């Protein structure tokens, strides 16, 4: 078997330290180091698009990156990927802004990237493509004669057929996805939603539950819940506190902490979370002066109106809640619209009695797993988790809540704040068992293993040709 070629919208810079890399980068680098190969993606730069591919090699891995023109970046990335696919796949059709030009830009850039990658592909390479920016990428490679094994992993949810078919070019997207040999999803619900969408548009046949045919194409589907590096997170969390954090911990020693961190995005349910916390203060006044909720939400896609709106809404809500319930010497809610280093966050997780993770819809949500892994197993905190996060399928010992029901979340927070040590230890141990079994290495190893087991298109094509030449029985 040849090299591994990874394609994603963005690549992690080759000289980034592991400590600053996110979970996806760690998983991809682990797979690349095992097989050797290439990581291909956008450099993050807009303009100077005629610049040759920028290549850097470290050991047995090569990074190859390209620039995008302003038009391509706007239509492919800002408009179609993030103003059509992202909201639709997160069940927010009210925020979808479809324009025919953006669809044309999306397909044009996928074709452009296929042209750029084509000369770099070797005969025995296997290709692993990532996420919603590149749904039609396999189709573009097939058009150019690439018969290598090509796998795809979707990091975000796949919506139900009723939602997906609202995207105007939904049929083209579905048929294009069937050009992959293996399609990986975060949850079984996502996998089934995809298959139901295909079955609604063409004849779908399934063999052994996971191998399918549609539009004359053969492909496999499977569930691969992405994981984390629990030992690395535990080490980061248990190290010495920086001076400012040590001082803050001392100041808060008589207060129980509820902690959340997510990038500022409408899919994360932040306004609903603030309302649920307010409901906790209203319904359980015994907690006044004894708890503090800290929400860290660094700005994301700040140029998009929907993101500007949610930022203003959160600032208003935080001020209103503090104005209503705050006391001299006690501010019930801290909202920080800024970025913190990942290592620092792991230390903060460890000293938070409650981790509050309540997205309205999420493919997985690694923050939930990171919070659990950062805890002291002898005195762990409690995870309050949305039932609509992919992580809820694995972390069943968390307190699962409906993020749309403020009373449900408030009741869970009250229960978490009062939970006895024995129950906290038991729930934490059960979640850690799952997190260790399905860590980031297990995720990438099982996906690559299954992709290698698929039948290459060239072999499949030759078999079909041979079958076609068999004499027909009279």
From Swiss-Prot:
Listed name of the protein: Trehalose-6-phosphate synthase
Give the record's family classification. Answer: Belongs to the glycosyltransferase 20 family.
Which InterPro entries does the annotation name?
Glyco_trans_20, Trehalose_OtsA
- Could you tell me which species this protein originates from? Enterobacter sp. (strain 638)
UniProt KW Glycosyltransferase keyword: yes
Query: What pathway is this protein a component of?
Result: Glycan biosynthesis; trehalose biosynthesis
One GO BP on record is: trehalose biosynthetic process
Oligomeric and partner information: Homotetramer.
Q: Which residues bind D-glucose 6-phosphate?
A: 10, 77, 131, 301
Q: What would be the name of the gene that encodes this protein?
A: otsA
Protein EC: 2.4.1.15
The UniProt catalytic activity note for this protein reads: D-glucose 6-phosphate + UDP-alpha-D-glucose = alpha,alpha-trehalose 6-phosphate + UDP + H(+)
Q: Which residues bind UDP-alpha-D-glucose?
A: 22-23, 263, 268, 340, 366-370
Gene3D superfamilies (alphabetical): Glycogen Phosphorylase B
One GO molecular function term of this record is: alpha,alpha-trehalose-phosphate synthase (UDP-forming) activity
Q: Keywords, A to Z?
A: Glycosyltransferase, Transferase
Swiss-Prot/TrEMBL site (Involved in alpha anomer selectivity) positions: 86, 156
Q: What function does this protein fulfil? A: Probably involved in the osmoprotection via the biosynthesis of trehalose. Catalyzes the transfer of glucose from UDP-alpha-D-glucose (UDP-Glc) to D-glucose 6-phosphate (Glc-6-P) to form trehalose-6-phosphate. Acts with retention of the anomeric configuration of the UDP-sugar donor.
């Amino acid at each position: 078997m040849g090299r591994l070629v990874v394609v994603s919208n963005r690549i992690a810079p080759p000289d980034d330290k592991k400590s600053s890399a996110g979970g996806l980068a760690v998983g991809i680098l682990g797979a690349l180091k095992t097989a050797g190969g290439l990581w291909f993606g956008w450099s993050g730069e807009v303009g100077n698009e005629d610049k040759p591919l920028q290549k850097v090699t470290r050991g047995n891995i090569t990074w190859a990156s390209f620039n995008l023109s302003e038009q391509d970046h706007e239509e492919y990335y800002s408009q179609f990927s993030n103003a059509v696919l992202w909201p639709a796949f997160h069940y927010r059709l009210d925020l979808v802004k479809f324009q025919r030009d953006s669809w044309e830009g999306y397909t044009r850039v996928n074709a452009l990237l296929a042209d750029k990658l084509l000369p770099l592909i070797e005969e025995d390479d296997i290709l692993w493509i990532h996420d919603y920016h590149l749904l039609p990428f396999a189709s573009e490679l097939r058009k150019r004669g690439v018969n290598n094994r090509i796998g795809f992993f979707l990091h975000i949810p796949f919506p139900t057929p009723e939602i997906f078919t609202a995207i105007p070019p939904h049929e083209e997207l579905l048929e294009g996805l069937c050009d992959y040999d293996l399609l990986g999803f975060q949850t079984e619900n996502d996998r089934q939603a995809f298959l139901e969408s295909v079955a609604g548009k063409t004849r779908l046949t399934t063999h052994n539950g996971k191998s399918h045919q549609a539009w004359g194409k053969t492909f496999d589907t499977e569930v691969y819940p992405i994981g984390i590096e629990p030992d690395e997170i535990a080490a980061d969390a248990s190290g010495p506190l920086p001076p400012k954090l040590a001082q803050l911990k001392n100041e808060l020693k008589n207060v129980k902490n509820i902690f959340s961190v997510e990038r500022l995005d409408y899919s994360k349910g932040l306004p609903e979370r603030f309302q649920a916390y307010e409901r906790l203060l209203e319904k359980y006044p015994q907690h006044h002066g004894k708890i503090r909720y800290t929400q860290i939400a660094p700005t994301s896609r700040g140029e998009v109106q929907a993101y500007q709106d949610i930022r203003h809404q959160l600032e208003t809500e935080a001020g209103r809640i503090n104005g209503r319930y705050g006391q001299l010497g006690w501010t019930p809610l801290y909202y920080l619209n800024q970025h913190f280093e990942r290592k620092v966050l792991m230390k903060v997780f460890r000293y938070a009695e409650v981790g509050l993770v309540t997205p309205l819809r999420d493919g997985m949500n690694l923050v939930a797993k990171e919070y659990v892994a950062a805890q002291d197993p002898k005195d762990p905190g409690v995870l309050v988790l949305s039932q609509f996060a992919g992580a809820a399928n694995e972390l069943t010992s968390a307190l699962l809540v409906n993020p749309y029901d403020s009373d449900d979340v408030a009741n869970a927070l009250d229960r978490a704040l009062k939970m006895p040590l024995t129950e906290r230890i038991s729930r934490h141990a059960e979640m850690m068992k799952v997190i260790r079994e399905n860590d980031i290495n297990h995720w990438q190893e099982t996906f690559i293993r299954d992709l290698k087991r698929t039948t290459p298109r060239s072999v499949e094509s030759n078999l079909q040709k041979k079958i076609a030449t068999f004499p027909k029985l009279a």
